[in-house]
Amino acid sequence: MKYLFLIIMLFTTSCASLRSVEGFDTLRLKAGNFNLAAWARITKPGKPLRIYVEGDGMAWIDRRTPSADPTPGNDTVLNLAQSDSYPNVVYLARPCQYLPSDTCRPYYWTSGRFAPEIIAAEQDAVNQLMQKYNAPSAELVGYSGGGAVAALL
């Protein structure tokens, strides 16, 4: 029984940890009612940021079935951020990707992916990043649904 407890504890601990990305700092942002994951490579604090906004991720299993977790299945946007030579690059996940929140439910990565509270959370995250790195401005690069989020911000 104590081994079962240990296995469960190891599993839940690993689910809550974010992977490391070479050359990037791992960030957890509390934005609105959501937890957002971000990775940042900042070499010139006080200068503008370039923020890559993740797409819709794994929103659907098939045409009719929403996934239980919208975390992207591939690293396309993260790879774009990693290959960018700009001095201050941030990869910003969408709400409910990588990190759970009590408010996460399929609505937020399906029909509600551009709901006011989602856009407000992304705006809050961008503001936090700009403040943290003393950035006078931020350039948003959105991929797929992240492009719509960037445009709405």
Sequence positions of predicted segments:
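A short loop-to-beta-strand scaffold at the N-terminal edge of the catalytic core in hydrolase folds
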Residues: A31-R41
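Alpha/beta-hydrolase active-site loop
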Residues: R105-K132
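Aromatic pocket-lining residues of Rossmann-like dinucleotide-binding sites
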Residues: L153
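Short, surface-exposed "cap/lid" segments of acyl-processing enzymes
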Residues: T43-A93, Y98-L99
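Sec-dependent N-terminal signal peptides
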Residues: Y3-T12
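Gly/Ala-rich beta-loop-alpha elbow adjacent to hydrolase catalytic centers
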Residues: L140-G146, A150
